[in-house]
From Swiss-Prot:
Biological role stated in the UniProt entry: Involved in the third step of the chorismate pathway, which leads to the biosynthesis of aromatic amino acids. Catalyzes the cis-dehydration of 3-dehydroquinate (DHQ) and introduces the first double bond of the aromatic ring to yield 3-dehydroshikimate.
Family: Belongs to the type-I 3-dehydroquinase family.
Name of the protein this chain belongs to: 3-dehydroquinate dehydratase
Pathway membership, UniProt: Metabolic intermediate biosynthesis; chorismate biosynthesis; chorismate from D-erythrose 4-phosphate and phosphoenolpyruvate: step 3/7
Binding site residues for 3-dehydroquinate: E34, L35, R36, R64, R185, S205, Q209
InterPro entries in alphabetical order: Aldolase_TIM, DHquinase_I, Type-I_3-dehydroquinase
Active site: H118, K145
Organism placement in taxonomy: Bacteria, Pseudomonadati, Pseudomonadota, Gammaproteobacteria, Legionellales
Subunit structure as annotated in this protein's UniProt entry: Homodimer.
Key words of the record: Amino-acid biosynthesis, Aromatic amino acid biosynthesis, Lyase, Schiff base
GO MF terms, alphabetically ordered: 3-dehydroquinate dehydratase activity
Amino acid sequence: MLNTPRICVVVIGKTLEEFLSQLEAAQTAVDFVELRIDYLEQINPNWVRIIKNHTHKKAILCCRARADGGKFLGTPEAQQEILQAGNDLGFDYLDIDLPVANKISIHEKKAKIIISYHNFLHTPPITELNFLLENMRLFNPDVFKFATKSEQYEDVKTLFKLLINKKNNENMIVLGMGEQGKIIRLLSPLLGGYLTFSSINGAISAPGQIDFKTMQDFYQRFYKISSPLKGED
């Protein structure tokens, strides 16, 4: 049985004003947002509080370092301070990258934790992805996330294999970056993926990210043609 897709719109404004404007637009479209505060030109825990006060839907707080494909240039200690503030303020999810997961410890955890792996160069073989998954399990996250550059059919197969073979009690996000990866972004939430990400008003945070309206139209058409016809054999 196919799952109902959960779509999360990414917010990436550079100034606080632009960020809040994007957040408002995103919240009129979906019930789930990812707040990429590493895109802000300046950031401090007080801004995290202001953003939280304007957040009315389920939200993932993400402060991704430049080394992991994000924009944040601060230290892991600064990341910890920002994410801890997000936890204390009541954000639903915190996204922590696997390379820094052993350096960031959230105290009195309230938020759900997403452990992420990003590879902007290629999709590793399934054996390597499974090894990374075992490393992620050491942190006992609520959600596992894999996003890799997908340039050919074999990359798509590898990511689908990772998703389909996950444990039944595990939540996993699997994304392909690039043109070939778009099919994974569309189909993974139908096949057991926890959610998929989309953009709004052209604010794209990753290669191959699909506009929310385009994604919504796809799912509407998909369910229309896949629904069983009553009264017919």
